[in-house]
Amino acid sequence: MSFSVEVLAGIAIELQRGIGHQDRFQRLITTLRQVLACDASALLRYESRQFIPLAIDGLAQDVLGRRFTLEGHPRLEAIARAGDVVRFPADSDLPDPYDGLIPGQESLKVHACVGLPLFAGQNLIGALTLDAMTPEQFEVFSDEELRLVAALAAGALSNALLIEQLESQNMLPGSSGVFEPIKETHMIGLSPAMTQLKKEIEIVAGSDLNVLIGGETGTGKELVAKAIHQGSPRAVNPLVYLNCAALPESVAESELFGHVKGAFTGAISNRSGKFEMADNGTLFLDEIGELSLALQAKLLRVLQYGDIQRVGDDRSLRVDVRVLAATNRDLREEVLAGRFRADLFHRLSVFPLFVPPLRERGDDVVLLAGYFCEQCRLRLGLSRVVLSPGARRHLLNYGWPGNVRELEHAIHRAVVLARATRAGDEVVLEEQHFALSEDVLPAPSAESFLALPACRNLRESTENFQREMIRQALAQNNHNWAASARALETDVANLHRLAKRLGLKD
């Protein structure tokens, strides 16, 4: 069997029929799998010494979420280095990255593999991988025929990446015009909710508008901020991060605007604040709703006039900073309650974005699980970490109140448990390895909350009571210290000091 002109023409026609790049990629690998009668095919994009799956056929869905580093996958490294068709014999010593990831064949290892590196000029932009359980499956196809397939795939991928680059406004005035692959943002997901979010990010990234990013705790608001910065003209300058919830009131102004020597006790030298550090770049203010009203007023002035004053200095400094802010609060309600300035809210929310909770993202759960499985595999030096069909169903049926962060922790914990019960360096995650509960923050009973040991003196009893109150407040507020301080009706700086004295933090 060999490729006829009709077969190659059919592949080219399928590429043109697709609606959008993703559809074309899927048509390409599905057609190739049919033509070559193989068990699995995948189109991968190359970036920063790793391969990122764009489309798959015949492989487990979580493959789309995995990131295959060259260091962790010697076969893919061989493909990247070869510059031509690479055939791996059935008895190859190099492990296949898809072992255990072909549905229905989880316990079997791939026997035949062909790798086709894809180039745009001299630049490696991706690879096409073809796998079969039959050792001699690809012997009937010549290298020249496979090179023709690679050329078709490379053309489709190169055009798609170039168009994506132009649409994202990464080809800015004054740039060299040379093709450069877009950086990976780790925003994994193909659900309608995530697709819409990515489109909105592309729209706003190239502008200079301030952006307010909303969403529940653990949804990935910081990744959204990174994607906006990365797609903006400011990407060559720094993205500076500040968690407003972790700022004691006494140092918050200095952290934001800097201070001069002698401004206060301990100010032994001049110090730049976050706004100065982010000059000509982007400042990401996480948990913006935790700022005091006094600091909100000073932040508003910077947004209005573009100048700052260091603490202890009468002079103003001009800064050119784009502000991205994130919160898990409903700032409209905070405005109505008098805890957030309405004028600052309107300044920040010129282009609001909402990061969907994981429970609304459908099969993205499996893609993200694949990503975290691959991370664990590399970190623990395992040959493979895969999800059983039962584990996939279990993850899809769970509500994920803690969102992506909870999923990450659940995968890491499951890998450790599975590794402890299985010899060797291959881990299969089963349903029983996940101890998932919708009651992430159980309400304590009055008895357990107020119970004190009977044999304590007054001081020890008081400290135990304080310790328990702080623990409960942190649990009920997602370990947010500022929110816990409000719940306990105390200053956040005092809460930090008390927690340290009680041994609750270092």
UniProtKB/Swiss-Prot annotation:
Entry superkingdom: Bacteria
Residue intervals of the Sigma-54 factor interaction domain: 187-416
Record has ATP-binding as a keyword: yes
Gene3D superfamilies, A to Z: 1.10.8.60, 3.30.450.40, Homeodomain-like, P-loop containing nucleotide triphosphate hydrolases
Recorded metabolic or biological pathway in which this protein acts: Nitrogen metabolism; nitric oxide reduction
GO molecular function: ATP binding; ATP hydrolysis activity; DNA binding; DNA-binding transcription factor activity
Residues with 4-aspartylphosphate modification: 57
InterPro entries attached to this UniProt entry: AAA+_ATPase (IPR003593), GAF (IPR003018), GAF-like_dom_sf (IPR029016), Homeodomain-like_sf (IPR009057), NorR (IPR023944), P-loop_NTPase (IPR027417), Sigma_54_int (IPR002078), Sigma_54_int_dom_ATP-bd_1 (IPR025662)
DNA-binding region: 481-500
Protein name per UniProt: Anaerobic nitric oxide reductase transcription regulator NorR
Binding site for ATP: 215-222, 278-287
Any one of the GO BP annotations: phosphorelay signal transduction system
Keywords carried by this UniProt record: ATP-binding, DNA-binding, Nucleotide-binding, Phosphoprotein, Transcription, Transcription regulation
Keyword check for Ribonucleoprotein: no
Function description: Required for the expression of anaerobic nitric oxide (NO) reductase, acts as a transcriptional activator for at least the norVW operon. Activation also requires sigma-54.
Encoding gene per record: norR
